[in-house]
């Protein structure tokens, strides 16, 4: 009985995260305040980068933090609330599933015909949910790679791969800064969840990968 209930609880966690993640900030902000659908411009992507092109950097920063925060919120909501209803001693469930589901919702939002972003900002939220130290680590690698390559997409993809190594360190998932995941399964559970998130990022960047291989991907221009 506990096994079936554990499965049901994890399915519930997934749906909670997915519905939260489907609240795509760039689409909502664009339609509410600018009467524009960000998906109709430039890359057609509903994320912070395209919002920068359409609405400017101030709005893009707000959207970026919303996309990050909603993943953290979904994970911590499950981590804080669910133990009051479902005892972790009786049932096996994983709060980080809510974070992964929120990333999927960001990429394929149910409220907006499943046309969303590429999930990069949402993956940052997933990293924070695992361990807040992973955020600055990822940031350092991303900006170093961006400065070196000038490609936002390539920097995002390489940083995604690099972070697998850091997540594989047991302390990152079970240490004092891992409140949302510590005590909910072994550290390898987080690795598996992150691998799914990484796979989604690569899938959503498949056109960028083609352009990178053909050397037609646009480079970031730095102002002096």
Swiss-Prot record:
It is a multi-pass membrane protein. Keywords: Cell membrane, Lipid biosynthesis, Lipid metabolism, Membrane, Phospholipid biosynthesis, Phospholipid metabolism, Transferase, Transmembrane, Transmembrane helix. It is found in: Cell membrane. GO terms for cellular component: plasma membrane. The chain crosses the membrane at residues 3-23, 54-74, 90-112, 127-147, 152-172, 183-203. HAMAP family: PlsY. This is Glycerol-3-phosphate acyltransferase.
